[in-house]
């Protein structure tokens, strides 16, 4: 099985007068003919083992649109959005640029 592209972005922030640090990271990967998955992690004082706070799975629909579903905590409305491949690429590019600026 051949894996597709893997892009990982990370950013962290902290206040000067505290040891608390918040770290955000996203992993984006694609397997041709299958699905695109974006996992986002948010941690306070990151530990070596962590689980995603949210996962977005984007499934190729009719070749023109992607269907996006967020896994959210129970009780939260699960909203569904539609992204074109161009919008999805733009969103990933913006996130990568923001992470590189930090």
Swiss-Prot record:
Any one Gene Ontology BP term: symbiont-mediated suppression of host innate immune response
Keyword terms, alphabetized: Host-virus interaction, Inhibition of host innate immune response by virus, Suppressor of RNA silencing, Viral immunoevasion
Question: Of which family is this protein a member?
Answer: Belongs to the geminiviridae protein AC4/C4 family.
Functionally, this protein is described as follows:
Pathogenicity determinant. May act as a suppressor of RNA-mediated gene silencing, also known as post-transcriptional gene silencing (PTGS), a mechanism of plant viral defense that limits the accumulation of viral RNAs.
Q: What is this protein called?
A: Protein AC4
The record lists the organism as Indian cassava mosaic virus
């Amino acid at each position: 099985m051949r894996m597709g592209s893997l892009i990982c972005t990370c950013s962290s922030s902290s206040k000067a007068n505290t040891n608390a640090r918040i770290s955000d990271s996203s992993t984006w990967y694609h397997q041709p003919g299958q699905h695109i998955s974006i996992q986002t992690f948010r941690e306070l004082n990151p530990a070596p083992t962590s689980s995603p706070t949210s996962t977005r799975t984007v499934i190729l629909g009719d070749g023109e649109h992607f269907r996006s579903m967020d896994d959210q905590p129970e009780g939260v409305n699960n909203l569904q959005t539609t992204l074109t491949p161009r919008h999805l690429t733009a969103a990933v590019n913006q996130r990568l640029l923001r992470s590189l600026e930090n």
